[in-house]
């Protein structure tokens, strides 16, 4: 004899939903995740750190995205290990080095960087740098991205309205 259990949600004893089941019968756990993107051209001066400007939230399950301060905020509810990706498309990159540095605090150009990712000079006029990393964030951490380039003048990020993600910060909790 077969049994059928019909539910829309599986809840924790504390009352929060742990797993939602869609109309197709597939479950999607409410694992914390975020995607914040750029949608405007940003000028990056030569030889100084410049914070990535984020302009829109694509997905944000736990109010991570802080558009006012251009960062992702972590709390005691969302602390843990995340798989993160940062990416930016550049327009006419003329510098020898283009760097994206992921940091976990509000201190720019300090000792609080998770990792430095560098791109060499592009052979064409456009270059898309994309990097993925794991990091364990604590309750007071943030995720912000700083640019650095060593050209003789400013370079610009590239933003095409037809493309959904020219520049972005994303992550989801894995542990």
Describe each model-derived feature in a short phrase:
Residues 1-16, 174-175:
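Short, intrinsically disordered N-terminal pre-domain segments
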Residues 2, 10, 79, 107-110, ...:
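Exposed regions on extracellular, virion, or secretory-pathway luminal proteins
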Residues 15-96, 104, 117-118, 124, ...:
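Terminal (often C-terminal
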Residues 68, 104, 109-138:
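Glycine-rich strand-loop-strand elements at beta-sheet edges
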Residues 80-90, 128-131, 141-149:
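Extracellular beta-strand-rich recognition modules
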Residues 98, 129-131, 167:
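Hydrophobic core residues within well-ordered beta-strands of beta-rich domains
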Residues 99-103, 144:
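Beta-strand signatures of extracellular beta-sandwich domains
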């Amino acid at each position: 004899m077969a049994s059928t259990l019909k539910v829309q949600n599986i809840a924790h004893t504390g009352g929060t939903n742990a797993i939602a089941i869609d109309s197709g019968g597939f479950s999607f756990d409410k694992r914390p995740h975020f995607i914040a993107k750029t949608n405007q051209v940003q000028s990056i001066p030569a030889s100084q750190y410049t914070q990535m400007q984020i302009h829109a939230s694509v997905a944000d399950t736990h109010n991570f995205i802080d558009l006012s301060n251009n960062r992702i905020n972590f709390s005691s509810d969302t602390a843990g290990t995340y798989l993160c990706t940062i990416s930016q498309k550049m327009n006419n990159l003329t510098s020898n080095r283009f760097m994206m540095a992921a940091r976990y605090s509000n201190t720019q150009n300090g000792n609080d960087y998770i990792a430095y990712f560098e791109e060499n000079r592009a052979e064409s006029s456009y270059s898309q740098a994309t990097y993925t990393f794991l990091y364990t964030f604590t309750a007071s951490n943030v995720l912000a991205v700083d640019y650095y380039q060593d050209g003789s003048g400013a370079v610009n990020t590239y933003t095409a309205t037809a493309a959904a993600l020219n520049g972005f910060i994303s992550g989801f909790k894995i542990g």
